[in-house]
Regions:
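Heme-based O2/NO sensor domains and their adjacent alpha-helical segments
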Residues: 17-44
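Basic, alpha-helical interaction scaffolds
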Residues: 264-281
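Non-catalytic, polymerase-adjacent accessory regions of viral genome-replication enzymes
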Residues: 1-17
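Acidic/histidine-rich catalytic neighborhood
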Residues: 247-267
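Duplex nucleic acid-engaging cores and interfaces of nucleic-acid transaction enzymes
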Residues: 55-69, 93, 97, 101
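Charged boundary/loop elements
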Residues: 1-3, 70-86
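Conserved polymerase palm-domain catalytic core
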Residues: 34-35, 40-41, 79-88, 94-248, ...
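Conserved phosphate-binding loops in nucleotide/dinucleotide-binding enzymes
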Residues: 51-58, 269-272
């Protein structure tokens, strides 16, 4: 948006040091203000049929967001649930799949394979900031986060080449350095509600906005209904066309680029959940 490139800082240490000192002074004097976010599009699939909107902050905003994330991540780590695996230190998809297998082996063979509609784009600012304020009391930090969330979006018209500026009333832009952390935070209450406070004792495994609820036979439909209500109360939407209830004993399902099926051991004759990369991955 401002035409400043990170390569400018990389080339010249003296320029970089002066730039960082000036930025530190802006933060100290509280004169720093977030800049508009540049909207770009990338293809979501190899067939190039669907596009995903990204919001790219300026270099200055990325640096400040990165510094804030370094400070805030350990604070919120204390609240994040053990079954949440995305954007966290020393966690990856294979650990999430191990938790899925563990739940299946415990008899939770009915799966709510949930799809959230445009999750990053729909996160309501007011409710998210309320969640942030539970742990962060520093008004300056709260104002920074509010400013990043509400930064206008700049998009170049592909036909005319003219810039269009629109206000950002909800969502946290995919492409922002702090966005994954905020997106994780907003679903933390759901992690605890399903895993710790639900009388059916299901297991929910979440990787950002990809999630599964694994339950005993006969419990999945009710849990899917409750999930929909929980999301609606927080101004989020369940994509009902893509969300499905799976009896894993009868059909396979995909999660995080893996296909899960039940197989029988050749020697032991015992059934076990088999995980392998999907064709799409």
């Amino acid at each position: 948006v401002d035409g400043f490139e990170v390569e400018t800082l990389a080339k010249d240490p003296a320029v970089r040091e002066a730039w960082l000192l000036a930025l530190a002074e802006e933060l100290r004097t509280k004169s720093y203000r977030p800049s508009p976010v540049r909207r770009v599009y990338i293809w979501k699939d190899q067939a190039k049929t669907k596009r995903r909107a990204l919001g790219i902050p300026t270099v200055k905003d990325r640096v400040v967001q990165g510094a804030a994330a370094i400070v805030l991540q350990p604070i919120w780590e204390a609240d994040f649930h053990d079954h949440s695996y995305a954007y966290r230190p020393k966690r990856r998809t294979h650990q999430a799949m191990d938790k899925v297998k563990e739940a299946l082996l415990s008899g939770k063979v009915e799966v709510v394979d949930a799809d959230l509609s445009s999750y990053f784009d729909l996160i309501p600012h007011r409710q998210l900031l309320r969640q942030v304020a539970k742990r962060v009391s520093d008004g300056s930090v709260l104002r920074l986060i509010k400013g990043w969330l509400r930064a206008p979006i700049v998009e170049e018209d592909r036909d005319s080449g003219r810039r269009k500026v629109t206000p950002n009333r909800c969502g946290t832009p995919q492409g922002g350095v702090i966005s994954p952390l905020l997106a994780n935070l907003y679903l933390t209450d759901l992690d605890h509600a399903v895993n710790d406070r639900c009388e059916q004792k299901p297991t929910m495994v979440r990787y950002a906005d990809d999630l599964l609820i694994l339950a005993k036979p006969g419990q999945g439909a009710g849990l899917q209904t409750r999930l929909k209500r929980w999301l609606e109360a927080r101004e989020l939407k369940l994509n009902e066309e893509k969300t499905r209830l799976v009896n894993t004993r009868q059909e396979a399902f995909e999660f995080l680029g893996f296909v899960v099926t039940w197989r029988q051991g050749l020697r032991s004759k015992r059934w076990y959940p088999h995980v392998e990369p999907s064709a799409k991955s």
